[in-house]
């Protein structure tokens, strides 16, 4: 089925991993389509949301109606903020877990994004036939683009160019406070205040806002209107020439122009402002003749600046499909050569050729991939009812080096349901909601640390610790927990270690340190002047300092090596929660690194370790390997078949 949203890519190739499911879910309808190849969007169907108890039911109905086989990858644009795994629609009664939905439908990948974020990603690919320019201005290539759209609400987003790709902004800008520009709009604001304590732009220039404007103008003119008049009625009356309806539409478009101008100057949207949503296209020529563009440019000293920025009305029939397709394609391409999808597909292809025991591991991986990722080998073997060597043989049959390699490939493909932004916990959240947000925020912070951690600095820190004569761990307040944990791990290496959480003890001990000694200083803020003075004394005597802290802090700048763990908890007034987890993770990385160094076949190191561990009656290499296993990152002994 050809649509306005279908691109004209000639002879587009089929997706190697099968058709992809695309969805655009609004408060009233859920639209579905299949993308068989890049830009080839077919089988578009629309389902009323009220007819299905859950989103999963609606998707299953579509897949049944479309008469297709397996779908591996799916992406959904939804008219709702997406802030973690749990999604509760504000303008519909659907509530769901992204991960639970993925499992229920058997998808390898399920992305759920805000509908205006998806629409924003479609903008660079729109042709002249899929948009109409309103007024003058010339868009500047590779510049920021703004997007707004009145529908049930007032959606807002933007696109920022970054090298050869675009970054979409998630935004709730429609909730910015409405500011009237003339006496008529003052009257509208006063009328709206009777109903809403906070009157946002969304209240007056989304679809329902036209009704508020209409009723405010009717009250001004002392006209009686029917109680059931809605936006569709007002638009119909305006097209028929009704004076009050025409004035309401004119006022609506003027307010929309003000908001569009605000968005343009806020984003610096020299690439243009695009208008989507379901309301404006229904206005037709009424919008073209409206004061929208004049109000857009009416920014006083910035009038010339706004005059150069073009405004466009999106006319493509299903533009959200284009955007959500682009987001899904980028997500899949960012994975390690598509390794995750290849693993799932290879499991399915090889399943019948596997032994019955290996087949049980395959079924566990397909149906419960996160269990494979998170569980140790002993639990995986127990859940699949096989031996541990069977699990290893299964992994190697897929071309993986072992269980760790298999877990990595599997995990890479499942990050689509893990939010990479901080989710706010709100009063009234249920335990399910706030529990998921706390876990999601922590997982997100760890994944971002993995992406941005300077591993050259990690290697340097491990070398310093491995060669240290003595290691002291300093942490004040909440950071003392991390220091004590580090001491507990590192004393197993036979290196003299101690942890101090008291500033006076730190000062007294640091004064005795010298060349060959190391201080690991853990601090969220990295700014405590007393701690900095203590470290200066030790460094002047020849000791080295490894800092686990935020970037660009005085501590990070002073340290011999800085391991930077930036995160959302940047205000010193906030209790360290995520930061503490990141600091503990850094200690684990350093401990595992030192264990690996000490297990290496180095004669001089082995001799030193042997002397240090003579009391335990174990060789240095064996002891270091034991410590690695003790740290839960070694290989457990294999059970026999």
UniProtKB/Swiss-Prot annotation:
ATP binds at residues 23-28. Residues 341-417 form the HTH rpiR-type domain. GO terms for cellular component: cytosol; membrane. Keywords: ATP-binding, DNA-binding, Glycolysis, Kinase, Membrane, Multifunctional enzyme, Nucleotide-binding, Transcription, Transcription regulation, Transferase, Transmembrane, Transmembrane helix. GO terms for biological process: glycolytic process. Residues 341-641 are annotated as: Putative HTH-type transcriptional regulator. Residues 461-600 form the SIS domain. It is a single-pass membrane protein. It comes from the Bacteria. Residues 377-396 bind DNA. It is an enzyme of class 2 (transferase). It catalyses: D-glucose + ATP = D-glucose 6-phosphate + ADP + H(+). GO terms for molecular function: ATP binding; D-glucose binding; DNA binding; DNA-binding transcription factor activity; glucokinase activity. Its EC number is 2.7.1.2. Gene3D superfamilies: 3.30.420.40, 3.40.367.20, Glucose-6-phosphate isomerase like protein, domain 1, Winged helix-like DNA-binding domain superfamily/Winged helix DNA-binding domain. NCBIfam families: glk, PRK00292.1-3, PRK14101.1. This is Bifunctional protein glk. The gene is glk.
């Amino acid at each position: 089925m050809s649509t306005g949203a279908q691109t004209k890519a000639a002879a587009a190739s089929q997706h190697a991993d099968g058709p992809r499911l695309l969805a655009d879910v609004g408060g009233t309808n859920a639209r579905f389509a299949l993308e068989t190849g890049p830009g080839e969007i077919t089988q578009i169907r629309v389902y009323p949301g009220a007819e299905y108890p859950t989103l999963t039911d609606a998707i299953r109905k579509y897949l049944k109606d479309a008469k297709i086989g397996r779908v591996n990858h799916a992406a959904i644009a939804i008219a709702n903020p997406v802030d973690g795994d749990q999604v509760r629609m504000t303008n519909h009664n659907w509530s769901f877990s992204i991960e639970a939905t993925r499992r229920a439908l058997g998808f390898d990948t399920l992305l759920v994004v805000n509908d205006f974020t998806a629409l924003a990603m479609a903008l660079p690919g729109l042709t002249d036939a899929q948009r109409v320019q309103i007024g003058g201005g010339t868009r500047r290539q590779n510049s920021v683009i703004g997007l707004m759209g009145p529908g049930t609400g007032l959606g807002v987003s933007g696109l920022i160019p970054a090298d050869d790709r675009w970054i979409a902004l998630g935004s709730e800008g429609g909730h910015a406070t409405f500011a009237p520009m003339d006496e008529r709009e003052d009257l509208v604001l006063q009328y709206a205040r009777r109903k809403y304590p906070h009157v946002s732009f969304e209240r007056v220039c989304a679809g329902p806002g036209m009704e508020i404007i209409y009723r405010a103008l009717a009250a001004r003119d002392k006209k009686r209107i029917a109680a059931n008049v809605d936006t569709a009625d007002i638009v119909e009356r305006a097209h028929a020439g009704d004076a009050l309806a025409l004035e309401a539409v004119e006022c609506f478009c003027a307010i929309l122009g003000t908001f569009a101008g605000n968005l343009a100057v806020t984003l610096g949207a020299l690439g243009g402002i695009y208008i989507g949503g379901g309301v404006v296209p229904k206005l037709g020529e009424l919008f073209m003749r409206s004061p929208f563009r004049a109000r857009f440019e009416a920014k006083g000293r910035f009038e010339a600046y706004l005059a150069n920025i073009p405004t466009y009305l999106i006319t493509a029939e299903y533009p959200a499909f284009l955007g959500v397709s682009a987001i899904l394609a980028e997500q899949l391409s960012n994975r390690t050569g598509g390794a995750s999808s290849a693993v799932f597909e290879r499991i399915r292809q090889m399943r019948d050729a596997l032994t019955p025991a290996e087949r049980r591991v395959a079924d566990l991986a397909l149906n419960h991939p996160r269990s494979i990722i998170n569980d140790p080998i002993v639990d995986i073997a127990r859940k699949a009812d096989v031996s541990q060597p069977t699990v290893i043989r299964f992994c190697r049959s897929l071309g993986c080096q072992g269980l760790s390699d298999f877990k990595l490939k599997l995990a890479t493909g499942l990050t689509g349901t893990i939010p990479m932004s901080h989710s706010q916990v709100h009063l009234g959240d249920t335990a399910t909601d706030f529990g998921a947000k706390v876990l999601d925020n922590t997982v997100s912070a760890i994944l971002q640390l993995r992406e941005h951690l300077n591993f050259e600095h990690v290697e340097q820190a491990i070398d310093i610790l491995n060669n240290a004569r003595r290691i002291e761990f300093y942490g004040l307040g909440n950071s003392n927990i991390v220091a004590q944990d580090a001491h507990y791990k590192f004393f197993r290496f036979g290196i003299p270690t101690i942890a101090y959480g008291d500033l006076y003890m730190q000062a007294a001990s640091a004064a005795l340190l010298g060349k060959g000694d190391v201080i690991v200083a853990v601090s969220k803020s990295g700014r405590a002047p007393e701690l900095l003075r203590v470290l200066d004394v030790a460094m002047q005597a020849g000791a080295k300092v490894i800092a686990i802290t935020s970037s660009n802090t005085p501590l990070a700048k002073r340290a011999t090596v800085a391991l930077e763990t930036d995160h959302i908890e940047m205000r010193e007034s906030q209790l360290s929660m995520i930061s503490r987890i990141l600091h503990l993770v850094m200690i684990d990385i350093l401990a595992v690194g030192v264990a690996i160094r000490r297990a290496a076949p180095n004669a001089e190191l082995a001799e030193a370790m042997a002397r240090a561990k003579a009391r335990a009656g174990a060789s240095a290499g064996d002891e270091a390997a034991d410590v690695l296993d003790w740290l839960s990152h070694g290989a457990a002994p294999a059970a026999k078949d």
